[in-house]
């Protein structure tokens, strides 16, 4: 699988290319294979050290690029690796089925849970089908329907957030985009079941927040969460989208900064180089975190759960 190296990963990409070339020669190299094996081993050590150095010192803009990586695991990838018996549920029962939101019932180590998440798509046709992960009102109303179903059947809700934002098209606005988002915020704040939200890529504005109100809000190590994209911010402040790196630094959109501000609860570690390098390992890290948090929340009665969530919301922005 091609890893689609980003601009700041060029030195790593060059080393990986050398290693792959030597491996190819080694496979057909006869007597020189032993010497090549030693050289490959040295280059692999050098590559590992370079990765550790690079990813231990990422800026906000580099993190934003990783959050958008085209091979990053999406909701359906987490479902595949971390859950069992997934049964997808479709439609908002009012207008249409928005493929930018996927959801349904699954089992997490035997527990029935409701899963809801954004889905961007990988190939061109799927990206168009999923509207590039930007939901319309019917997507958020589908999510609302599933959340209310989960409450009726006393199932915990797990959400996966990865969107540039809610779709801003004319049709979406005509069908009540802002109302759909606002209704979700209201309903999620009062659900009588545990809700765990996970930002796994881009957390873009109200489009992310519409499935992001919960008892725990987690972010992956290289995900982002912000009111606007760095490019959008730069276009407004400086009339120049090329200043997106400066905007990213100023916005405080990274997981460590948001945890420092107490806007999120936990940061989930990614494999070295980012979640796209090992979907199975990333899903395992996610699963372990979900199980621990669910065990904590399942000890609480409804009143305590709601009071704790209310206090969490009221503390946002409090200094």
Curated annotation (Swiss-Prot):
Subcellular location per the Swiss-Prot or TrEMBL entry: Cytoplasm
Residue span, CoA carboxyltransferase C-terminal domain: 35-296
Organism superkingdom: Bacteria
Any GO BP annotation: fatty acid biosynthetic process
Pathway(s) annotated for this protein in UniProt: Lipid metabolism; malonyl-CoA biosynthesis; malonyl-CoA from acetyl-CoA: step 1/1
Primary location: cytoplasm
Catalysed transformations (reactions): N(6)-carboxybiotinyl-L-lysyl-[protein] + acetyl-CoA = N(6)-biotinyl-L-lysyl-[protein] + malonyl-CoA
A family per Pfam: ACCA
Xref: HAMAP family: AcetylCoA_CT_alpha
Protein name: Acetyl-coenzyme A carboxylase carboxyl transferase subunit alpha
Organism: Vibrio campbellii (strain ATCC BAA-1116)
